[in-house]
Amino acid sequence: MTGPDGEGTGAIWAAAGPAIKTSNSETRSGKRAFISIDSCHYIAVMLKVMIAPVTPFQQNCSIVWDSETMEGTAVDPGGDFDRLKQAIDEQGIKITKVLLTHGHVDHASAAGTMAEHYGVKIEGPHKDDLFLIEGLPESGRKYNFPAYKPFVPDRWLENGDTVSLGNLSFDVVHCPGHTPGHVVFVHKPAQIAFVGDVLFRGSIGRTDFPFGNHEQLLSSIRERLWPFGDGMQFVPGHGQTSTFGWERKTNPYVADLLFDD
């Protein structure tokens, strides 16, 4: 089965990179499980991440929180709201905002419902994705998604903005190409980025959508993401985690050896 972003659906993945583990026994029963990024890897900043592949498209919703204040967010809650809520509440996380990388249905559908439930605002993506946000009800019907609450983000994000979460601060990087308003959230102290569908392990985002632009996507990755350094680990919108350095060496679309500069 192929999702709206062109990524194949499948079973829970054992994520690559340090200190990542499955957090419960659901994998053994064949159900979708959560993936945890253990805070011991980021002991100086106390950032915690739990990755939940949601909907039949297995879109990686990242639940991110400051373990000192327990203030948290969901990055790209594309669906399965009840399941996300249960995990959030079990961890004792206080959701203070919802973050969106872009406006595609598998990333944004449940954002309005989550924001209403927790009484918080939605931040992101960039305003150039407004047409996708406005089209979510129609897109949801096309892919048989539940009828989640329509919304318009409370804060559109620009390149160079920052997003706060408890004592944590994330850089906002506008990375158009997959969609015109796509943004990436980067936490430099923890060396982790939430990249949505800009970059995958061994691949890049599709650009055969309205206003997609392949050359623009390549430029976004090489000019706006690579400068954060090879050690930056990233959580993609689908599939396994990786690092910028690994993709610069091996990715068949953006490896350094493909470019003359």
Language-model segments: what does each one mean?
Residues 79-164, 168, 249-257:
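Active-site HxH/HxHxD metal-binding segment of metal-dependent hydrolases
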Residues 68-69, 79, 105, 129, ...:
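Short, glycine/acidic-enriched loop or turn micro-motifs at the edges of active sites
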Residues 74-75, 96-103, 123-126, 174-177, ...:
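Active-site neighborhood of phospho(di)ester-bond hydrolases with catalytic His/Asp-centered motifs
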Residues 46-91, 184-196:
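Conserved beta-strand hairpin/beta-sheet module of binuclear metal-dependent hydrolase folds
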Residues 33-45:
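Short, Lys/Arg-enriched N-terminal segments with co-localized hydrophobic residues
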Residues 11-17, 32-35:
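Residue-level detector of structural "landmarks"
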Residues 138-139, 162, 168-261:
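Metallo-beta-lactamase
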Residues 1-8:
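N-terminal helix-forming leader/targeting segments
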